[in-house]
């Protein structure tokens, strides 16, 4: 059984995404520190997680050169427990040395043109493109994206996930259309708390609860 531990990072962010659940809902993700990894091994073991996903709270690759000690420590812990790993990022032109350690990289795309920037750095690695479904997205847009991915040698998986608005409420844009194509042409992710969440030695079972009081 696959069980994810989602490590929420906050190294800072470029704040260029058209919609940001963290910024728009004023979620206070704790600042990421090296000492904040002290309980990561226990979190993996106690929750019996076999997959670790790194996301934000700010893009995990933001100013990555200043945080190589954090990445070295975090990934060493994952390897100790033989965890499958993935990284979420919206940086298409950055591939730090530690990225080769991930089994999957999830690229957060804003438009179909972002797909042109995705390519395989390591053949063992899966590339997934993910789009947040916005109010202006059409069925034709979704179909064009799916067509491109199906013909791409560099993108292995495609997913669409629903937007969470400024009141932390899930929207359901193109819901029926996306659900009909789920596991056929793409993965459709309705927003929910699927994972165990970890940030700065704290474990929660809802994303929102990882935030500072």
Task: Tell where the protein language model's regions lie, with residue ranges.
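Generic structural signal for short, flexible, solvent-exposed coil/loop and linker residues
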Residues: 2, 6-9, 41-43, 50, ...
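Conserved glycine-rich "GG(E/T)P / GGGxP" loop and the immediately following alpha-helix
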Residues: 23-152, 156-162
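Canonical Radical SAM [4Fe-4S] cluster-binding loop centered on the CxxxCxxC motif
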Residues: 1-35
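Bulky hydrophobic/aromatic packing residues
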Residues: 21, 99, 201-203
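Auxiliary Fe-S-binding modules of radical SAM enzymes
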Residues: 1-2, 160-213
